[in-house]
Amino acid sequence: MKFSKRVLLRLKNKNKKLKPDKYKKLKRESVRGLIKGTVERPRLSVFRSNENIYAQIIDDTTAKTLVFCSTLDRDIKLNSENGRTCDASRLMGQKLAKLSIKKNITKIVFDRGPYLYHGRIKALADGARAGGLQF
């Protein structure tokens, strides 16, 4: 059964009958509705799990992934204890910036998804900025 965004928010606020995964999907769609990746400025999409963090740069006009990086990469695993730390996220952001600059991508749009701009997400963004990406 599909609900409109207004109905979902009303359910969340009044009855508390909305399941967390549906609320997360609604939140992701509300953020993504404002952000579109183009050829000039592709979208940097972030996914965070309990153990690792994944990021990819996507061109939404052709729906193709241009660059991908995660904390499971060998370089990042060797330099950090595990993928749950902000240091690992910062290293991953720098590596992602290096890979994207090799493909002549310097300007991007940051899509944090349903996550708050805090902790590992912020560390990834700071690492990408330090690596040379502009957003």
Swiss-Prot record:
One of its GO terms (biological process) is translation. Pfam families: Ribosomal_L18p (PF00861). One of its GO terms (molecular function) is structural constituent of ribosome. It is found in: Plastid, Chloroplast. It comes from the Eukaryota. GO terms for cellular component: chloroplast; ribonucleoprotein complex; ribosome. InterPro entries: Ribosomal_uL18_bac-type, Ribosomal_uL18_bac/euk. Gene3D superfamilies: 3.30.420.100. CDD domains: Ribosomal_L18_L5e (cd00432). Keywords: Chloroplast, Plastid, Ribonucleoprotein, Ribosomal protein, RNA-binding, rRNA-binding. Its main location: plastid. Part of the 50S ribosomal subunit; contacts the 5S rRNA. Binds 5S rRNA, forms part of the central protuberance of the 50S subunit. Belongs to the universal ribosomal protein uL18 family. NCBIfam families: L18_bact (TIGR00060). This is Large ribosomal subunit protein uL18c. The lineage of its organism: Eukaryota, Sar, Stramenopiles, Ochrophyta, Bacillariophyta.
